[in-house]
């Protein structure tokens, strides 16, 4: 079972881990931390609640129900996305199990849902909302590298935004065609040029706080203005969208309104997206994950 950022958020909440202390016994350890007073209002509903952790995992089916579908899973190595996965055993519906290809270990399949489905979900969102290319921040992450491989395979334009030259080098070595380093003095000009080249009008931002989301919208508007055939004081009529899906920067999200009126900014999370597209579409995404698990 892997530890995803969403698992860490559930494990620790708003706790100040610098105050952590360990008690209990070796067989049943207890970790106690303090929550800053300013954060307690947001954590109030959690007090006294038992919240099992672990979004995803994989293992061997050792017992099953009487249905043919369940019995067919006996002895199979399966991946599961169902919560409460930090356990030795987990009971879950047969139709929520993804049978892994022969020769795949549980360790190889344990992380085959959250990051791969998130990357595929971003591409699917782009398509469903009528965009032709996308922007991704914190692009040198494991998720970002997966998204880069997907876009290269599917022929989709992708603008990768990173924070360090070595991250840019990593992605370029993996075939990334558009990489913009936010630490470079020419970042905004580089980003605008990449947006002109790809036509990207949707972005997925893992940072959340700071000026980056607004800068992306501003550069999208500047890129669209280069090909505009007529002037409008309201800016381009092409919709520009930024979805925030992470909080690497916990500060306020700052925007400067220099991108017209055809824009949107909102949140994006994997599980609400999967609920929205329905079981058939979700199964198609899972099937692709299984088919490309070792790519």
Predicted segment positions?
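Adenosine-nucleotide cofactor-binding segment
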Residues: 153-231
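A structural motif shared across PLP-dependent enzymes of the aminotransferase-like
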Residues: 82-94
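Mid-domain Rossmann-like dinucleotide-binding core that forms the NAD(H)/NADP(H) cofactor-binding site
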Residues: 112-185
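Glycine-rich beta-strand-centered segment in the early N-terminal region that forms part
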Residues: 1-2, 14-82
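Cytochrome P450 core scaffold surrounding the K-helix E-X-X-R motif
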Residues: 5-11
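Short helix-loop-beta connector
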Residues: 73, 102-105, 127-134
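C-terminal boundary of histidine-terminating zinc-finger modules
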Residues: 107-109
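Glycine-rich phosphate-binding loop and adjacent beta-alpha segment
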Residues: 206-294
């Amino acid at each position: 079972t892997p530890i995803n950022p969403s698992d860490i958020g559930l494990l620790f909440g708003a706790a100040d881990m610098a105050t952590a202390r360990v008690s209990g016994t070796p067989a049943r350890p207890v970790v106690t931390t303090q929550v800053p007073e300013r954060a307690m209002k947001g954590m109030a509903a959690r007090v006294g609640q038992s919240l099992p952790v672990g979004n995803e995992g994989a293992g061997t089916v050792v017992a099953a129900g009487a249905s043919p579908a369940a019995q067919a899973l006996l002895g199979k190595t399966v991946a599961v996305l169902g919560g409460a996965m930090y356990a030795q055993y987990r009971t879950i519906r047969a139709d929520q199990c993804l049978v892994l290809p022969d020769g795949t270990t549980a360790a190889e399949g344990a992380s085959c849902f959250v990051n791969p489905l998130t990357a595929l979900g971003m591409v699917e969102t782009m398509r469903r909302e009528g965009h032709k290319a996308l922007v991704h921040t914190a692009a040198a992450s494991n998720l970002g590298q997966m998204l880069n491989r997907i876009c290269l395979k599917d022929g989709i334009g992708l603008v990768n935004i990173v924070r360090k030259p070595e991250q840019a080098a990593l992605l370029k070595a993996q075939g990334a065609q558009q990489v913009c380093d936010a630490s470079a003095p020419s970042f905004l000009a580089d980003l605008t040029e990449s947006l002109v080249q790809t036509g990207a009008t949707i972005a997925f931002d893992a940072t959340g706080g700071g000026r980056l989301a607004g800068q992306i919208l501003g550069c999208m508007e500047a890129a669209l203005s280069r090909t505009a055939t007529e002037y409008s004081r309201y800016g381009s009529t092409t919709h520009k969208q930024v979805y925030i899906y992470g909080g690497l920067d916990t500060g306020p999200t700052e925007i400067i309104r220099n991108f017209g009126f055809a824009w949107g900014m909102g949140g994006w999370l994997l599980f609400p997206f999967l609920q929205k597209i329905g079981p058939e579409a979700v199964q198609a995404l899972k099937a692709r994950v299984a088919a490309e698990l070792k790519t």
